[in-house]
């Protein structure tokens, strides 16, 4: 079957777009805006990045820590110190998510809880980042506190992200909490999805 003259490939279509002056101008504006935002973000993070570099953690953005499998325990005290500083939401979220490791619990659990309690649900990015950090940093020694946070409806939909920390525990109170939280409209969908995922075809 032959391709008609009106049919073009994606590559051909993109080449035609590149030749369109309006498209090229819009693309240049988008790229310029992206470069500007990246430069502003690097400038805003400069103090944090210098502090990290001083302990041997060399990254171009705090989000590099979120996306690495390498250990950076030495950086945790610095991240905790900067978590409460007046950064933009995107950077604060990155700091919070970088603290989402088990080694944070012994040195920074109270800081994470305090920041989670203080952050309004309307600040979704930071609130979610802190919830992820709490869930990943938690262990059985703070299980009761994690459950209490998940039950507090004033914390909004970010509570869904706390559930993985509760689910990970094998303690009876964790299972009881999950059963109770399954009745919460904001959490029930996530909890019921676990049950569906655990079913095996016969």
Model regions and ranges:
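Intrinsically disordered, serine/threonine- and proline-rich low-complexity regions
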Residues: 1-55
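Generic low-complexity, intrinsically disordered sequence content enriched
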Residues: 12, 18-21, 116, 147-150, ...
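Structural detector for internal amphipathic alpha-helices that build alpha-solenoid repeat scaffolds
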Residues: 25-37, 50-72, 81-85, 90-104, ...
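Amphipathic alpha-helical scaffolding segments comprising HEAT/armadillo-like alpha-solenoid repeats
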Residues: 39-51, 72-85, 104-118, 139-151, ...
């Amino acid at each position: 079957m032959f391709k008609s003259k009106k049919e073009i490939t994606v590559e051909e279509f993109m080449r035609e777009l590149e030749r369109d002056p309006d498209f090229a101008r819009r693309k240049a504006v988008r790229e310029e805006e992206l470069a500007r935002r990246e430069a502003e973000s690097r400038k805003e993070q400069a103090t944090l990045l210098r502090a990290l570099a001083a302990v041997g953690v060399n990254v171009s953005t705090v989000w590099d820590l979120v996306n690495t499998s390498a250990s950076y325990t030495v950086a945790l005290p610095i991240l905790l110190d900067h978590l409460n500083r007046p950064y933009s939401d995107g950077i604060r979220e990155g700091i919070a998510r970088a603290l989402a490791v088990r080694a944070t619990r012994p040195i920074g659990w109270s800081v994470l809880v305090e920041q989670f309690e203080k952050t309004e649900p309307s600040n979704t990015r930071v609130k979610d980042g802190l919830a992820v950090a709490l869930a990943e940093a938690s262990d059985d020694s703070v299980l009761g506190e994690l459950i209490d946070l998940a039950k507090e409806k004033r914390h909004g939909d970010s509570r869904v992200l706390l559930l993985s920390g509760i689910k990970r525990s094998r303690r009876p109170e964790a299972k009881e909490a999950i059963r109770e939280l399954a009745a919460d409209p904001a959490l029930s969908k996530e909890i019921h999805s676990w049950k569906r995922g655990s079913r095996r075809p016969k």
